[in-house]
């Protein structure tokens, strides 16, 4: 966030200074050194004035925000500056070497550096990057032009040289493209119908609203160090200025440059810099992978060389910014200024960020030429094509490391709320007040989380809350990659890891290399479509032995190198069964070579000498039994240092990742895959949420309670008619049974009469001791009541003694019989004494 506009008092004082002529060019005060201006086609000598409330004062080390007035190009420019607190981390490191070649490390105090960034008042989307250590030295980017400013040598009046950047004379630098392509691109840049750079900025920021951060590491070679008088402090300050300029260029794409480290080869160059640019680049990225990246984490490393390569300004890999093995570039820093050199580094770093050359494409940047012009024009503006290329990289999940916002302990220690970097003491930083209006998680005025928020940014943060442990935050991209998961207590996704280089893949026909399974068929299909496949070995030998642009094994100096027979499979890729033209957005040159009954297809993308050709065989490709391609040579696969003992270390239930830790299969637990678990590794994060069982419990309740109940309800609804009928039938049967039971208990019912001797036994009429019912002979009465016949005297205990029942209420049959007592049958009981003889009734005849 820059300083505020001038107060009325300051504006009045400014007009007074202008009226007195104190801010105009001071040509008579001093003359520029010829060596300082010989490379400039035009310039002005100016005296910047620092704006304060009362008087001009010297720049102090504690100045966080300053403003200057510059009168140049017939206009008055008021620039507002603030110290670039994002430029250097608190743990900024400088590596050097002693005379014995031993590595030395130093953490210089950079908390009070004098490198500033800012803007020009009244100029929309302007950017300023200057060093105020000894005068003002840096760049001013206006609407459609860029200017340089630097102190005038031997001046005692604070005089400076102010010059347009496109007016610098320099040795032509090229990237190997034809003049026709360069002229075509230059013509396109002059077309008036193209939108302004302001419109470009608005459009890009709408597409890429999330800021990316490039953690840059710079390496300076021995010759450049000697050229600077073997002064480590001077080299360090020069590279910090370089990083500040880069930051001012990339900010238009919403990309920030953070210089995380510097290495100066003070004793000797640890790599061979003899040969062509491709050779040196290959040597540098191999050294980086083996030594530098193991010492200090970074996203891209750029080598600064004094040596030139026949007019080639530099070289870098395309789209490899987060790669462990290819995220690097080389840059020639000869007899040019740091401001001019910044455009070269911005160009090569742009290749790492997925940007191709603008040549031959409909590109515009609001200037005559753009940064990604292959002619290394010294422009300060990125084109619409560069923005689109970077957008494609991000949409294809490339550059994931750029979302790694520097953590508070890695950021510059002087906090600045509103710079979109989380400084020490801050929990979040949403930027300007306007940007914070749409941030739901962060309080812009305090850079603290809102009361309900757990986080405000990161791959494992959603709706201001941590994603649950086990949530995948980085998916698996190939059979040689592994996924990463959130841990439930951090907004950051774990660092990207993959299966260790050298692990067999594609049914043991290839090796894993940097997270990809490298084999010829896959490379042919990427270029020529899904039906293409690798050509026979004879094709590789015949084509790559020629040593031209369509068949070679890299460069030897500025010339193509012929492939030896043993290295032919590591040169230009040769394919057959080609039915589709290349699927790349850039149309390459295609060559077809007949060879022994087949057609060998190859391509040359003409990307320039600063970009490795995608038509070459990929490094890590299996070129023979136990061998891989490395730097255009077929070498033993032992260079991959694969040492994973799957059976011993991972117990046969996992593989080793790039950190040489076991990544376990599903069902086994890290770190050694010897116990039951959920898979993953100590590097990937938990593959499940060990603390939360809500999902599991919910599923159990759903499947074992809710689902059965719903199924039962559906069954009952479908069978409701049948069930209703069955229920009615059962109820009717039960009712009938009760009615029959009631009828059986009716008094005087002849059907239930029993003889005294037991159930279902009737006695002949007129027998001894049997009374006859009033209804006629042959009808027996129930025993036990009055009028029940008893055995005659003298029979003793021949018959059981009846038990008399309680008196029952009177019954009224349809045909009333005479009143009769009712007794119940008691079965065969043995009385304790003989019962009295029952009374005898005579029939009513």
Swiss-Prot record:
Resulting phenotype, residue 202 to A: Does not affect shedding activity
Gene3D superfamilies linked: Collagenase (Catalytic Domain) (3.40.390.10), Disintegrin domain (4.10.70.10)
Binding site for Zn(2+): 347, 351, 357
Cofactor remark: Binds 1 zinc ion per subunit.
Disintegrin domain segment(s): 414-501
Top-level taxon of origin: Eukaryota
PROSITE patterns: ADAM_MEPRO (PS50215), DISINTEGRIN_1 (PS00427), DISINTEGRIN_2 (PS50214), EGF_2 (PS01186), EGF_3 (PS50026), ZINC_PROTEASE (PS00142)
Catalytic site positions: 348
Cofactor(s) demanded: Zn(2+)
Location of the Peptidase M12B domain: 212-406
Mutant lacking the gene: phenotype: Deficient mice appear to develop normally, are viable and fertile, and do not have any major pathological phenotypes. In adulthood, 20 months after birth, mice display progressive retinal degeneration, disorganized retinal layers and a degenerate retinal pigment epithelium.
UniProtKB keywords: Cell membrane, Disulfide bond, EGF-like domain, Glycoprotein, Hydrolase, Membrane, Metal-binding, Metalloprotease, Phosphoprotein, Protease, Signal, Transmembrane, Transmembrane helix, Zinc, Zymogen
Span list, region Disordered: 729-845
Enzyme Commission code(s) on record: 3.4.24.-
Domain (EGF-like) ranges: 644-698
Residue ranges with Polar residues bias: 734-745
Post-translational modification: Proteolytically cleaved in the trans-Golgi network before it reaches the plasma membrane to generate a mature protein. The removal of the pro-domain occurs via cleavage at two different sites. Processed most likely by a pro-protein convertase such as furin, at the boundary between the pro-domain and the catalytic domain. An additional upstream cleavage pro-protein convertase site (Arg-56/Glu-57) has an important role in the activation of ADAM9.
Extracellular side: 30-697
A GO cellular-component term linked to this record: cytoplasm
Function, as annotated: Metalloprotease that cleaves and releases a number of molecules with important roles in tumorigenesis and angiogenesis, such as TEK, KDR, EPHB4, CD40, VCAM1 and CDH5. May mediate cell-cell, cell-matrix interactions and regulate the motility of cells via interactions with integrins.
Protein name per UniProt: Disintegrin and metalloproteinase domain-containing protein 9
